[in-house]
């Protein structure tokens, strides 16, 4: 008698039935997106995910893992070179940075446990293009509101991502490069600017689009959640996890930390569980970025966190003052060096307000180091209270017992 083959089925195998039974608002589209990604995998494409750890890229990652787990468990012949690129700008909101680090650690463990053909690529700006070297080093000014060119975005994110991608692909046979598909979490409803940008490049959630990059090479992209609303995204995340009442499997127990952070830093309220009658409820509109960003008049998400829960997020008040100073310094010519940086063909240098004066740069550096020191003192105080039992021994307090940021290090 032949032995009977059997397979232990879990939520990763049966999630589609779970979605149908749960009557999720986004259930049908979720299944459709996973099937599209699965088809890309079967076609031998190499999927690159641009992952920030925000709600949209988190959703795309979740959808991709559903497709990849299906392929691996089915024994399908797929590329071993799928990869995730994550950019650490080194000047991010510390809450976002710490949450991203914890997610990436959990994702790494999940990839190893399930033997997935997926690599995590984490990149940081080079020393010369870092915010610290450019601004505190006196090489340039912050990217203020209405600037024609977003120098900070180019240096900290775009160039860094391109360099990391090129470095990874250099390890792969060049003939396979044309099979790389960049999967993005951009959505039309984020803003008119984002919608126009997607349309400019012919972005689609139904098929791959290919455009020439800056070097004339074909670059293929895919926008799986292009038409999704904020409510759709929260519907997906609130139903994802490994817990008993989660419909969609995930590498995380749940996405409560992401939901709570957006709720605390935004102008809307997160909807944990939605039905067809609640999709129009307010959703989280918070945007998170670098704590030194002056592309807007204020870091609204950080300020909202501080005012919402000073006991929890008040440690960021100091670095938020740096953002306010930078924003208010834009038209204060007393803060500028009067000697330009560019020498003309005739050998002249313009005398006009240019980068920050060395005295201002010294003050900014002193402020950064001081807030780094104060953060270390705060963390040490929490650690001592944990040891003496003055505060509860829980995940949050253990996390707060180590510095949440250090923006000036010995390597800088």
Language model features by range: what are they?
Residues 51:
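The Walker A (P-loop) glycine that initiates the GxxxxGKT/S ATP-binding motif of P-loop NTPases
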Residues 54:
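Conserved G/P- and acidic residue-centered "switch" motifs that form tight phosphate/ATP-binding loops
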């Amino acid at each position: 008698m032949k032995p009977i083959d059997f397979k232990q089925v879990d939520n990763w195998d049966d999630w589609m039935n779970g979605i149908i039974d749960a009557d999720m608002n986004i259930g049908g589209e979720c299944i459709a997106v996973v099937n599209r990604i699965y088809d890309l995998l079967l076609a031998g494409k190499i999927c690159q995910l641009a992952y920030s750890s925000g709600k949209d890229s988190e959703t795309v990652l979740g959808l991709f893992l559903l497709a990849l787990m299906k392929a691996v468990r089915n024994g399908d012949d797929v590329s071993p070179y799928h990869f995730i690129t994550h950019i650490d700008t080194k000047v991010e909101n510390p809450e976002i940075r710490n949450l991203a680090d914890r997610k990436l650690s959990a994702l790494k463990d999940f990839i190893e446990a399930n033997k997935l053909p997926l690599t995590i690529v984490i990149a940081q700006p080079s020393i010369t293009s870092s915010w610290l070297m450019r601004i505190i080093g006196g090489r340039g000014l912050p990217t203020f509101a209405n600037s024609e060119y977003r120098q900070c975005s180019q240096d900290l994110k775009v160039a860094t991502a391109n360099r990391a991608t090129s470095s990874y692909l250099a390890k792969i046979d060049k003939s396979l490069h044309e099979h790389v598909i960049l999967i993005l979490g951009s959505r039309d409803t984020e803003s008119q600017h984002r919608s126009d940008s997607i349309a400019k490049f012919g972005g689609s959630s139904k098929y791959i689009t290919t455009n020439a990059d800056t070097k004339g090479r074909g670059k293929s992209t895919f926008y799986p959640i292009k038409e999704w609303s904020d409510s759709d995204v929260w519907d997906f995340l609130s139903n994802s996890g490994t817990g008993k009442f989660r419909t969609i499997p995930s590498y995380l127990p749940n996405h409560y930390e992401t939901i709570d952070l957006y709720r605390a830093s935004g102008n809307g309220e997160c909807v944990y569980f939605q039905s067809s009658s609640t999709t129009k409820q307010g959703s989280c509109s918070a945007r998170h970025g670098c704590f030194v960003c002056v592309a807007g008049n204020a870091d609204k998400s950080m300020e909202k966190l501080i005012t919402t829960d000073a006991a929890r997020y008040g440690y960021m008040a100091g670095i938020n003052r740096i953002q306010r100073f930078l924003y208010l310094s834009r038209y204060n010519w007393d803060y500028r060096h009067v000697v330009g940086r560019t020498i003309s063909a005739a050998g002249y240098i313009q005398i006009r307000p240019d980068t920050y004066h060395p005295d201002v740069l010294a003050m900014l550096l002193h402020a950064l180091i001081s807030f780094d020191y104060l953060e270390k003192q705060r963390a040490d105080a929490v650690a001592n209270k944990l040891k003496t039992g003055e505060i509860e021994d829980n995940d949050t307090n253990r996390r707060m017992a180590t510095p949440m940021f250090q923006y000036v290090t010995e390597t800088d």
